[in-house]
Amino acid sequence: MKFKKKNYTSQVDEMDCGCAALSMILKSYGTEKSLASLRLLAGTTIEGTSALGIKKAGEGLGFVVQVLRADASLFEMKKVPYPFIAHVIKNQKYPHYYVITGANKNSVFIADPDPTVKMTKLSKEVFLSEWTGISLFLSPTPSYQPTKEKTSSLLSFIPIITRQKKVILNIVIASFIVTLINILGSYYLQSMIDSYIPNALMGTLGIISVGLLLTYIIQQVLEFAKAFLLNVLSQRLAIDVILSYIRHIFQLPMSFFSTRRTGEITSRFSDASSILDAIASTILSLFLDLTIVLMTGLILGLQNMQLFLLVLLAIPLYIVVIIIFTPLFERQNHEVMQTNAILNSSIIEDINGIETIKALASEQERYQKIDYEFASYLKEAFTLQQSEAIQTAIKTTVQLVLNVLILWFGATLVMHQKITLGQLITFNALLSYFTNPITNIINLQTKLQKARVANERLNEVYLVPSEFEEKKTELSLSHFNLNMSEISYQYGFGRKVLSEIKLSIKENEKLTIVGISGSGKSTLVKLLVNFFQPTSGTITLGGIDLQQFDKHQLRRLINYLPQQPYIFTGSIMDNLLLGASEATSQEEIIRAVELAEIRADIEQMQLGYQTELSSDASSLSGGQKQRIALARALLSPAKILILDEATSNLDMITEKKILKNLLALDKTIIFIAHRLSVAEMSHRIIVIEQGKVIESGSHSELLAQNGFYAQLYHN
């Protein structure tokens, strides 16, 4: 099958190359799926997409997928089933996928998901040096039916625009009046040259001049009103576009965040700004610039049709400039946004890990990495700016040449007494009101190109379904027993992290899960709060499958306190009350901080509960952060608490006091701990090794068994 250029798909984020390659093959057979959907089907992780993931996704969409390890002899076959996907180590540095669209004796033709490369050819020598040999061949099954997923174009923003129609109308009216005043000023110049000066009409000149001055004052008032309304419009559009993105981000499942770098998510805010800029510019161009072009075009035609026809000759040149620069701007905008996302991720990562960087004395090493990424971003941004500057220079040259031709031809008409000098000067003055709006419309190309790329990137987030899409009624429970039946879980299509877990936890039981690092302890408890869905098996609470619960209700019933408690910017009181009921009393707050053994620490601070904290709470010790987070969890209405290494930063004495307090509570508490002193005090201990429950019992029972737990305890 011949690969068509229209089927090319570029990757949006760093780890999208596998899904983008799959998308190209699917398009060749009439199926269109967003990269967001393909990431879900292929089990893409933060490390990228595996060949197995692409195989599973293809099979799920009605294809037979063969994964083979081939060599150079593949291209010597008479019938090679193009296009196919090849796994490569690009530039001998990082794993990547190409779509192979054809080959000849010396070259291999590829479609590279990298938007800076797109469709090109490589010498066979270069390709074979990169190719790992792994190749994926897709062919439709007899029952295959093409499917097309709906994605939002820039037209989807029309409802947002129409909501602001009153503001837009006022901006257009103000701009229209301002332009009319400027046109009147041009005719004043014509009358002055052709009538008032030759005929010495001093009185008329004075009256007209004063009138024009007053008109210009009104014009500036309208200019201010227009600028004010533009700011209002910009802010309202920002609320609609940026806040809706943030709202959607908060509603996405944990799997979305675990498979993307932070910078890839935050860089979409600047993408949204590009869309806002394009929307605002498009509104003004559609409603104002087009109107002014038509109006001034009519006036210029009435002024002198020969000169006006000369002006119209420049428009095809502008159109040619747009067509030439369109693919260039698309590619360069993609690259600028992608390098910006990588840079943002690194900066956020390094600021969050600054303590570790300083502890390892690796400031220079991390700086050099950011320096390299920043240089890459600047290089791409500079290339884009150069292209924009070249386009601007071409447009300006066309405009200047046009002005010279107008004056040249117009002067000839004046010499032949076909028009007056005043008419020529007025025509030249009015010309800017015709060409400037055309220039504004042409300038939309760059903004709309950037906005289209930005919209594609936003779509990849918007197309990830919210975890709250299904409206579920709150369920009433007669008891709070937890039961896990044959639970297995794996990230993407990698190895199983959990395998056939069977576990029952009674209401008010105090249970500790132990095991070496990487055994699956944290993953198991995250399934209990629906952060991730089990690959197989069921989990019930009160006899009801967790999938039937509204997630907000479930997380109010089961509170998970992660290994790294997060303290938010605000006061200690703000942090304590996050997630608590609005009716929480002072007595309940005091009770919670006492149970967490943090009351004395807080009350010794100068501002007590009103002490302001930054997001990293650098003024607090690790143990204080953990205890504030624990008090916050205790203030939640949860019947079940999951404490993932929640006391790991505490001294043994404080930890023992807190454990004693927690064991006395009328709640189910699940501890995850490396310190076996926590396990000793709990009712039951579950030992996990390589994703399986291998032992269960009390501390004394497990020691008596002399198994894995006993080894951990004695060692």
From Swiss-Prot:
This is Lactococcin transport/processing ATP-binding protein LcnC-like. GO terms for cellular component: plasma membrane. Gene3D superfamilies: ABC transporter type 1, transmembrane domain, Cysteine proteinases, P-loop containing nucleotide triphosphate hydrolases. Residues 168-450 form the ABC transmembrane type-1 domain. InterPro entries: AAA+_ATPase (IPR003593), ABC1_TM_dom (IPR011527), ABC1_TM_sf (IPR036640), ABC_transporter-like_ATP-bd (IPR003439), ABC_transporter-like_CS (IPR017871), P-loop_NTPase (IPR027417), Pept_C39_ABC_bacteriocin (IPR005897), Peptidase_C39 (IPR005074). It comes from Lactococcus lactis subsp. lactis (strain IL1403). Its EC number is 3.4.22.-, 7.-.-.-. ATP binds at residues 515-522. Its main location: membrane. Involved in the export process of a bacteriocin lactococcin. One of its GO terms (biological process) is proteolysis. The active site is at 17. The lineage of its organism: Bacteria, Bacillati, Bacillota, Bacilli, Lactobacillales. Residues 11-138 form the Peptidase C39 domain. The keyword Protein transport applies.
